[in-house]
């Protein structure tokens, strides 16, 4: 019985982790290569790492980690991790 509960909790945790860490399709690779080519011609014009609308650390991000500027949404809040 205990083993069954542990397995169920582990599966639920891994499923939730997969959904939280999944990439948002809005920031996919569809425009990455043309922008990268333009970046090679003019490195100052690079906007690949900038997002128009992102939340600063400490703000509520819900379940969409792509909305955080730092791309880390943990427990529904944007985080900034420094190593």
From Swiss-Prot:
Tissue localization of expression: Expressed by the venom duct.
Chain positions found as 4-hydroxyproline: 57, 65
One Gene Ontology term, aspect cellular component: extracellular region
Disulfide bonds: 54-69, 61-73, 68-78
Signal sequence coordinates: 1-22
Pfam families: Conotoxin
Keywords of the record: Cleavage on pair of basic residues, Disulfide bond, Hydroxylation, Ion channel impairing toxin, Knottin, Neurotoxin, Secreted, Signal, Toxin, Voltage-gated sodium channel impairing toxin
Domain of life: Eukaryota
Primary site of residence: secreted
Subcellular localization: Secreted
InterPro entries: Conotoxin (IPR004214)
Domain notes from UniProt: The presence of a 'disulfide through disulfide knot' structurally defines this protein as a knottin. The cysteine framework is VI/VII (C-C-CC-C-C).
Function: Delta-conotoxins bind to site 6 of voltage-gated sodium channels (Nav) and inhibit the inactivation process.
Protein name as it appears in the record: Delta-conotoxin-like Ac6.1
Lineage: Eukaryota, Metazoa, Spiralia, Lophotrochozoa, Mollusca
């Amino acid at each position: 019985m205990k083993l069954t509960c542990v397995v169920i909790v582990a599966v639920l945790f891994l499923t939730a982790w997969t959904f939280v860490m999944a990439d948002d399709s809005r920031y996919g690779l569809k425009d990455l290569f043309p922008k990268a080519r333009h970046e090679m011609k003019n490195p100052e014009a690079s906007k690949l790492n900038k997002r128009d609308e992102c939340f600063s650390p400490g703000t509520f991000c819900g379940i969409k980690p792509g909305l955080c500027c730092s791309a880390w949404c943990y427990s529904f809040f944007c985080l900034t991790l420094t190593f």
